[in-house]
């Protein structure tokens, strides 16, 4: 199995998005006539300002699989509200047996996250965060759990509107 090798891909597009390949896996389909080899790629793209997407692509050749994954990631982007380069509050996310814990960090802390989570935060524009992964270390499940956690994060104004209060009342 291919290990986590972050790198920024450049396929000639000029849409201002950062791209990172998380994993490329050689997969095999066994048929009556023998084995059919193909490649599966897992990638993330982000604009560096809170928008991030993940994609998976399969093809007979690695570059085609990576291109398909990048296109899929561009189509499935989510917007996450950031505060000074970090998340607003502690949040957890799960996918399968993977569980991730995300916590805001003080400026200058950096990205303290392992494996595929780091790539997600780098392309998203997060500069300071503490993240811990529990359970499965499968890169796909870890990225999906990270996305689930990011989707669950809320801004103070969202919390205030749900409670029918002002933002100042929430902090006091």
UniProtKB/Swiss-Prot annotation:
The N-terminal domain interacts with the head of the 30S subunit; the C-terminal domain interacts with the body and contacts protein S4. The interaction surface between S4 and S5 is involved in control of translational fidelity. Part of the 30S ribosomal subunit. Contacts proteins S4 and S8. Belongs to the universal ribosomal protein uS5 family. SUPFAM superfamilies: dsRNA-binding domain-like (SSF54768), Ribosomal protein S5 domain 2-like (SSF54211). This is Small ribosomal subunit protein uS5. Signal peptide: none annotated. InterPro entries: Ribosomal_Su5_D2-typ_SF (IPR020568), Ribosomal_uS5 (IPR000851), Ribosomal_uS5_bac-type (IPR005712), Ribosomal_uS5_C (IPR005324), Ribosomal_uS5_N (IPR013810), Ribosomal_uS5_N_CS (IPR018192), Ribsml_uS5_D2-typ_fold_subgr (IPR014721). HAMAP family: Ribosomal_uS5_B. One of its GO terms (biological process) is translation. NCBIfam families: rpsE_bact. Keywords: Ribonucleoprotein, Ribosomal protein, RNA-binding, rRNA-binding. The lineage of its organism: Bacteria, Pseudomonadati, Pseudomonadota, Betaproteobacteria, Burkholderiales.
């Amino acid at each position: 199995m291919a290990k986590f090798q972050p790198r920024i891909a450049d396929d000639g597009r000029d849409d201002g998005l950062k791209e990172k390949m998380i994993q490329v896996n050689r997969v095999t389909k066994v048929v009556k006539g023998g084995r059919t080899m193909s490649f599966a790629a897992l990638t993330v793209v982000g604009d560096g300002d809170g928008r991030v997407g993940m994609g998976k692509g399969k093809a007979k050749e690695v570059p085609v699989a990576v291109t398909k994954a990048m296109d899929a990631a561009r189509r499935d982007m989510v917007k996450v509200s950031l505060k000074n380069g970090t998340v607003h509050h502690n949040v957890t996310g799960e996918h399968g047996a993977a569980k991730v814990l995300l916590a805001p960090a003080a400026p200058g802390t950096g990205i303290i996250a392992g494996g595929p989570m780091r790539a997600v935060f780098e392309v998203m524009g997060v500069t300071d965060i503490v993240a811990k992964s529990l359970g499965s270390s499968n890169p796909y499940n870890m990225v999906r759990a990270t996305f689930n956690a990011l989707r669950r994060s809320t801004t103070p104004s969202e919390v205030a509107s749900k409670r029918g209060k002002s933002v100042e009342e929430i902090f006091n």
